[in-house]
Regions:
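Non-catalytic, mostly N-terminal accessory regions of nucleic-acid modification and defense proteins
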Residues: 1-101, 160-173
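Conserved S-adenosyl-L-methionine
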Residues: 80-178
């Protein structure tokens, strides 16, 4: 099998073992137009990330790598679609103002999930633990929604993120959610 087919099979295996990613991960790496050499080089680069026994540390490293790629993609994709990526510094200030120690965090236009990542970091930095908050969000751009789902999975954040192409202000997928 080609490297693309192996990656597609790996994506399907990940979806099978992580139901929150079902139908989210791309499985089109075997297509002819994709440069197999570059794909192999990217896999080699990612494989150098230290995934050792310290799972929290390895999740953070993988999360930062994901965030780096996400920043580049979201910036380019958002400008094409009239959407904008909220800078991490703004998200950090919002999180500090909200002080999400426990309970629910809801973002009606969650994009790639930056508010959720920062909220979990806030909880941990203030003596709490991941899981002290539950995160909920909505996103109308299907590609960005998929990125958010992957972002949460990479970081081990349990999240309920809904997608609808009308947007949360026109069609609220979480209307029954209470504060």
């Amino acid at each position: 099998p080609t490297i693309g087919k192996l990656v597609d099979d790996a994506m399907l295996a990940i979806e099978k073992s992580n139901t929150s990613l079902k139908g989210v991960l791309p499985t089109n790496y075997a297509r002819e137009a994709l440069n197999k050499t570059m794909l192999g080089e990217l896999i080699d680069l990612i494989s150098t990330i230290g995934m050792n026994e310290e799972s929290d540390k390895s999740k953070d490293i993988l999360g930062r790598v994901y965030e780096y790629f996400l920043g580049g993609f979201a910036g380019a994709e958002g400008k094409r679609g009239g959407e904008y990526f909220t800078p991490r510094s703004i998200v950090r200030v919002l999180t500090e103002m909200l002080e999400p120690y426990k309970g629910r965090v809801y973002d009606p236009c969650c994009g790639s999930g930056g508010m959720f990542v920062q909220s979990e970091k806030f909880v941990v930095e203030h003596g709490g633990r991941v899981g002290d908050i539950r995160v909920y969000g909505q996103e109308m751009n299907n590609t960005t929604w998929r990125l958010a789902k992957m972002n949460m999975a990479v970081r081990g954040i349990d999240a309920d993120i809904k997608w609808n192409n009308e947007g949360s202000f026109h069609k609220d997928e979480l209307a029954d959610l209470k504060a």
